[in-house]
């Protein structure tokens, strides 16, 4: 027998029932409040009439002024029970809404665990995200390309053949997290897989650690193996790629590093790192991966050739 939707999404159904129960729990209270208001309006009209008679103070009135005041006071006292009833009804309605909110808060975590992230967040609007490309000035792009070329030149001078051999041996033993970062030429030549469905914390470019605020770059990691100092300096980064807190911005969404991210294999990629939900991925793919901009650029270059 197949499993019904109620059994699959039990937490979601309970969450929906809590939302549906909000109008039912307060509708009766509000109806009673309207009925009390109607009764109070009738008494209010009687009070206004009594006040008018007292102010006129007619001599031929059947009741004296004191009797009229006592009668007015008695009428006013009739309103007090209605006021107490309205306070009780409003308090009950507030408590019912509060209990529904507490129920929603308690079940929200289970709903997130029950529904996959891809189904909850959906796929991003690629065209909307691509609008950022039009806001980047040619001068900014040229500065970034110049910075990348400078970094690659420094890296090629510092990374000797002996260090490449040592890094490759350490990568096979999986004993050192620093040995997992190689140049693209070295990785493809030795047929070392660049990505996997469940990569180690520091063994792949496509899975930076979620605890770090900024993904590790290839050139930066490799320089740490040689002299312990990062190659990329903060003063070489463009101001448009820095957040207000001074952190590097990545991806189409122009946010800081968080969660699981994937890196583009194009050395001249403008954004470098991308959040998996922003590119429509659930887990890092195997093999070489390019962002849509770099992929379209490569296709246009091939068509020209």
Curated annotation (Swiss-Prot):
Keyword Transmembrane helix set for record: no
Domain notes from UniProt: The PHD-type zinc finger mediates the binding to H3K4me3.
GO biological-process terms attached to the record: DNA repair-dependent chromatin remodeling; regulation of DNA-templated transcription
PHD-type zinc finger segments: 248-297
Binding residues for Zn(2+) 1: 251, 253, 275, 278
Tagged with keyword Acetylation: no
Modified residues (Phosphotyrosine): 181
Functional summary from the UniProt entry: Component of the clr6 histone deacetylase complex I' responsible for the deacetylation of lysine residues on the N-terminal part of the core histones (H2A, H2B, H3 and H4). Histone deacetylation gives a tag for epigenetic repression and plays an important role in transcriptional regulation, cell cycle progression and developmental events. Has a role in silencing of mating type genes.
UniProt region (Disordered), positions on chain: 135-239
Classification via InterPro entries: ING_fam, ING_N_histone-binding, Zinc_finger_PHD-type_CS, Znf_FYVE_PHD, Znf_PHD, Znf_PHD-finger, Znf_RING/FYVE/PHD
CDD domains linked to this entry: ING_Pho23p_like, PHD_ING
Quaternary assembly: Interacts with H3K4me3 and to a lesser extent with H3K4me2. Component of the clr6 histone deacetylase complex I'composed of at least clr6, png2, prw1, pst1 and sds3.
Any one of the GO CC terms: NuA4 histone acetyltransferase complex
Protein name, entry field: Chromatin modification-related protein png2
Organism, scientific name: Schizosaccharomyces pombe (strain 972 / ATCC 24843)
Subcellular location, record wording: Cytoplasm; Nucleus
């Amino acid at each position: 027998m197949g499993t019904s939707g109620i059994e699959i999404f039990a937490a979601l159904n309970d969450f929906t029932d809590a939302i549906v129960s909000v109008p039912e729990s307060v509708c009766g209270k509000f109806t009673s409040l309207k009925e009390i208001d109607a009764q109070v309006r009738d008494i209010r009209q009687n009070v206004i009439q009594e006040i008018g008679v007292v102010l006129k103070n007619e001599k031929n009135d059947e009741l004296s002024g004191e009797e009229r005041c006592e009668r007015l006071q008695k009428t006013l006292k009739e309103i007090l029970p209605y006021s107490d009833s309205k306070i009780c009804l409003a308090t009950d309605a507030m408590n019912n809404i509060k209990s529904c909110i507490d129920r929603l808060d308690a079940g929200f975590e289970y709903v997130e665990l029950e529904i996959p992230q891809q189904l909850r967040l959906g796929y991003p609007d690629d065209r909307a995200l691509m609008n950022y490309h039009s806001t980047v000035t040619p001068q900014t792009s040229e500065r970034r390309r110049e910075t990348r070329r400078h970094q690659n030149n420094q890296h090629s001078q510092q990374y000797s053949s002996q260090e490449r051999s040592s890094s490759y041996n350490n990568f096979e033993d999986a004993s050192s997290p620093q040995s997992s970062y190689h140049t693209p030429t070295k990785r493809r030549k030795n047929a070392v897989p660049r990505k996997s469905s469940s990569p180690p914390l520091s063994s792949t470019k496509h899975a930076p650690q979620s605890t770090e605020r900024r993904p590790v770059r290839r050139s930066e990691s490799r320089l740490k193996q040689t002299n312990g100092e990062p190659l990329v300096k903060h003063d070489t980064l463009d101001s448009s790629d820095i957040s207000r807190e001074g952190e590097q911005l990545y991806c189409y969404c122009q946010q800081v590093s968080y969660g699981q991210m994937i890196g583009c294999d194009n050395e001249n990629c403008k954004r470098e790192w991308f959040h998996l939900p922003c590119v429509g991925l659930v887990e890092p793919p195997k093999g070489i991966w390019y962002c849509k901009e770099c992929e379209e650029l490569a296709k246009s270059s091939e068509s020209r050739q």
